[in-house]
Amino acid sequence: MPSDRDHDAGIFAFFGAVPRSDRCRQTRGGGEVVDGSSVFGHVPVFAQRCVTLLAPALTRHHADGSNAILVDATLGVGGHAERFLTEFPGLRLIGLDRDPSALDIARTRLMRFADRVTLIHTRYDNLAVALNKFGYAAVESVDGVLFDLGVSSMQLDCAERGFSYAQDVPLDMRMDPWSPVSAADIVNNYDEAALADILRRYGEERFARRIAAHIVRRRAHTPFTSTAELVALLYQAIPAPARRIGGHPAKRTFQALRIAVNDELNSLSNVLPAALDALTVAGRLVVLAYQSLEDRIVKRVFADAVSSRTPAGLPIELPGHGPRFRLLTRGAEHADAAEIECNPRSAAVRLRALQRTQHGVEPQQPTRRGDS
């Protein structure tokens, strides 16, 4: 059960103990965290578009969002949550995040909405468990779900987290500091084949085998402890012509390790069906992805969700077997120049959204209807 200190104003419930922390609680200018999008220079990506897409679901009962529930499955420091709670003064919001430091900041930021907010410390693929734990059904209980994927600006800016290759810090990369495996654990202990597989699958690194071989040779006499040590090795392992194109030579390796440490792609694959199940009829799901591996998963799950459930080969649509969802976006939406100028992080975003149209739980492995 959550402790008393985790219930400021009797509202903020935490799924697991979340100690208050001063880690990385300053803005770039060194000041204390304050409410608003100035926190850590944090501006929520595509905030207005997310509001526009989710508003019809959140205002079905009342224009102010009363009786509606929104799950922000990647709460972070609360930028999107603050926007929705301000826009819809009757809305109830459930915020999930695995990062206790982010939750601590969001908790302060959203305190003025405390009577309408529940914050839960958990991975987002525990969505169904979290809903049940706090009194909500895992099926058809919420009006909207929002995912803003990837590493946050706060995590990148917090040097000690080890996400950035621009600083010499411990090789960590854990979104939840209590997670058992760090990037250093992977680099120092996984065998060469496993390392190469991680770099190839999660970083799409074409020099994966070469880098893995260099890592294994180096760690045999000196284990890796810092990001700078790994960056130096990558400069040695990647051929000079390749280093001069395609961005920083460490970019793909760091992405791959971060995804592996935090099990990001498996978590995403597992949570999307649960998020679809959680939506009420007319409920909406919005996902912001920042790299192609995430977006492919979202695209595939959405395509399955909007497909007919009539068995392949039948010449007609069986009654009651139509799709339970419809797409709200044509392909992935991208930020325009104005959005990118306001928020450079939005340059990489791919936004997809859909809406539930019928009752029913989605199968784990949906079967697509074939051509008649």
From Swiss-Prot:
Q: What is its EC number?
A: 2.1.1.199
Which cellular component terms (GO) are annotated to the entry? cytoplasm
Keywords carried by this UniProt record? Cytoplasm, Methyltransferase, rRNA processing, S-adenosyl-L-methionine, Transferase
Pfam families hit by this protein = Methyltransf_5 (PF01795)
Main localization (coarse): cytoplasm
MF annotations from Gene Ontology:
rRNA (cytosine-N4-)-methyltransferase activity
Q: What does this protein do?
A: Specifically methylates the N4 position of cytidine in position 1402 (C1402) of 16S rRNA.
The similarity comment for this entry is:
Belongs to the methyltransferase superfamily. RsmH family.
Descriptive protein name:
Ribosomal RNA small subunit methyltransferase H
Q: Which organism is it from?
A: Mycobacterium leprae (strain TN)
